UniProtKB/Swiss-Prot annotation:
Annotated organism of origin: Daucus carota (Wild carrot)
BP GO annotations: ribosomal small subunit biogenesis; translation
Record NCBIfam families: PRK05327.1 (NF003717), rpsD_bact (TIGR01017)
One GO cellular component, as annotated: small ribosomal subunit
Keyword Transit peptide: no
Name of this chain's protein: Small ribosomal subunit protein uS4c
Length: 201
């Protein structure tokens, strides 16, 4: 299944706020209206919607998300927590959380078009897994810095998570540590996502 490129507002009206996909927010009460129209949700649908939230927020294909779930399942610790850490430490998401892009699709474009350096080297793979002590900068070119400055000039998003530090005048971000789960930028029940996939196999 390919990455979603359809109307974004339609998704947030059904699933709630997805800051990685769009900075728009559903109107107050729209969740309640949707629920009353559709009646009581089945457990399957609840798990499916949590999975879809994760997929659309981080801009993943179904295959990519399944791959991350499998990697998380083999790691030590809670599968759900590890899954969120893997997704949050992607380069495209780190750029978004730093405010260097207003959405994750926007961050992905910066990476694909070779505007971003990690530790002084161009990285053009959005799924690159960032590590503690990584230094993320814009290329020293007017076009690259102008794109990021536009994001800095946009209305600010949520508070900067503790695992990141931004130095905006240098167009630089630092990864201080692996993210703590309480700083994940999405309201999600990750256990339902893991349950969804465990019931598919």
């Amino acid at each position: 299944m390919s990455r979603y490129r359809g109307p974004r507002f339609k998704k947030i009206r059904r699933l709630g706020a997805l800051p990685g996909l769009t900075n728009k927010r559903p109107r107050a009460g729209s969740d309640l209206r949707n629920q009353s129209r559709s009646g009581k949700k089945s457990q399957y649908r609840i798990r499916l919607e949590e999975k879809q939230k994760l997929r659309f927020h981080y801009g993943l294909t179904e295959r990519q998300l399944l791959k991350y779930v499998r990697i998380a399942g083999k790691a030590k610790g809670s599968t759900g927590q590890v899954l969120l850490q893997l997704l949050e430490m992607r380069l495209d998401n780190i750029l978004f959380r730093l405010g260097m892009a207003t959405t994750i699709p926007g961050a992905r474009q910066l990476v694909n078009h070779r505007h971003i350096l990690v530790n002084g080297r161009i990285v053009d793979i959005p799924s690159y897994r960032c590590k503690p002590r990584d230094i993320i900068t814009a290329r020293d070119e007017q076009n690259s810095r102008a794109l990021i400055q536009n994001s800095f000039n946009s209305p600010s998003q949520d508070e900067m998570p503790k695992h990141l530090t931004l130095q905006p005048f240098q167009y630089k971000g630092l990864v201080n540590q692996i993210i703590d789960s309480k700083w994940v930028g999405l309201k999600i029940n990750e256990l339902l996502v893991v349950e969804y996939y465990s019931r598919q196999t």
